[in-house]
Every structure is written in C-alpha cells, then in structure tokens.
Amino acid sequence: MEVTVLEVAPRDGLQNERAIVATADKIRLIERSVEAGLRRIEAVSFVNPQRVPQMADAEAVMAGVPRVPGVSYAGLVFNDRGLDRALATDVDEINVVVVATDTFSRRNQNCTTAEGVQRWSALARRAAASGVRRTVTIAAAFGCPFEGEVSAAAVLDLVRRVAAAEPDEIALADTIGVGTPDRVRTLVAGTAALVPGVPVRCHFHNTRNTGYANAVAALEAGAGILDASTGGVGGCPFAPAATGNIATEDLLYLLHRMDIGTGVRAEAVSATGTWLGEVLGSPVPALLGRAGGFPPARPGSQ
C-alpha cells in the first residue's frame, strides 16, 4: 500500500507563529522537505497579509523554492486577488477552503458557507482554465469552535455542493482536533461514495491526541492523501485552541511500521523538525526526534 503525505508546515505550520519566520528559513524548510522525499508541499498562503502577517512573503518564498521534477507546490487561495497572485508565481496547485459552518466561515473568510461555495466554484473555473490542480478543503468538518457539533449529513451535503465544480481532490479537515475514528470513517467513506474517482485527502490536528488514530481510520476508509506538518507545528489563527497538526515524522513512523509506503525518509524529516524547533526558539511537539526510530538505525545505514 502506498500513501501520499502532503507537507503543510511551510503554510499551516508557520501561519500561527507570532514571531515572523525569515523568508530564507521558510525556503530552507521547503528544501529540506524535498530532500527528505516529500513531493507535495503546501508552501504558501495568498491571503491578506494584515490578517496573516506570517504569509506576507508568499511571492518571495515561491521565487526561492527548488523546482525539482515531480515536486508540486500548493498555495492557499481565498479570492480572485489571491488566485491572481498564485498564478503569477507558477504554483502547481491551489487549495480553496470552504468552512462547514456559517459562524466560523464569517470569522475565517468573511462570508457564509453558501458564499464560500460560490467563491470556490468561481476560483475553480479560473484555475482549471490555467491548468492548475484544484483542491477544495472542507474546514471544521468534524466540529466547529463556535457552533459545536457538525452533522455528518451537513458535511456530506457540502461535499456534494463543492463537487459540482469538479475538484481534483476533496479534503476533509479536522480544524480544531475534535474528530474520532468512527466519524472519520463515516465522512471519508461517504465522500468517496458521493464523488467516485475523486481522491479524498484528510487534514488532522492532534489537539486532543486523536490525530494519528484518525489518520489510520481515514486510510482504512479509502483516503489516499494525508496532510502533516514537520515537527507537529501549526494551527488556525481564527479558531480558539486549534493547535497541533499531526507531525510528519511521527506519522511516517506509524505508516512505515505498518508497511505502508510513502517514499519519504522519516529520519530526515525528524532532523528537520529538530532544526525547525531551533528556528522557532522552542522544541517542536513531534516525538520521533526525541525517542528515535525503531529498530534503531545502525551507523552508516540509510
């Protein structure tokens, strides 16, 4: 079995950091990720820099990323202005977020969920015309920090609505880390049944220590792409206590011990997590860098 791990540390991982990370360090994070074998990377966010100052240098980051055959760079886009910026940097993919509840959608994107669907549809048409891969992410799919529970029926209805714009991929995001494996199975299997042939991707946070169990449940239910953040850094600046992306290195250890292939070197990602902690000035939440792999690597082994 093979699974794609999509690295989100350069975007979702860093966006919640208060101290601005230098552009050169962002580019180095991406370079190290590519060197470790990661081939899909969400590198930047083309949003209003006043709302997310950490992403103000998106164009500079994209100008410095290594252009390696087989490596695909994604940018988060909310509106036409963001898409204009993204297309000008030659991104390979765009990710457009549609939030599952009106309250969170207004706080996150200043629009209702219905308006978010309309925005996504318009952006998808433009991106398709430009030959750019299109992902739509349903945020707060497993629960909302303001409205509480979000029913599976409501999420699957939203899947049906966003699917009308023919995404290349549909992502289900546990934005505040409240999901559990049973709910994950229901939504992943339900999404796959509604849009057969469209890959299902999942984005989990480990806020309440369920992220890795949810990742396994997603794979069992048919998801083929998992987001993860080197070091386990990140969160949403517009959702209270939305901390703790699942850590790329810890997820890789789990997958590799289950004989699930990724094409990524966990030890290299773990070393990057340690380096990233030094850049940020505090140890990262990931555990592999502290405990090490198993069986322990022999000197000189790869």
Task: Report each predicted region and the residues it spans.
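Catalytic cores and adjacent flexible loops of soluble metabolic enzymes
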Residues: 1-302
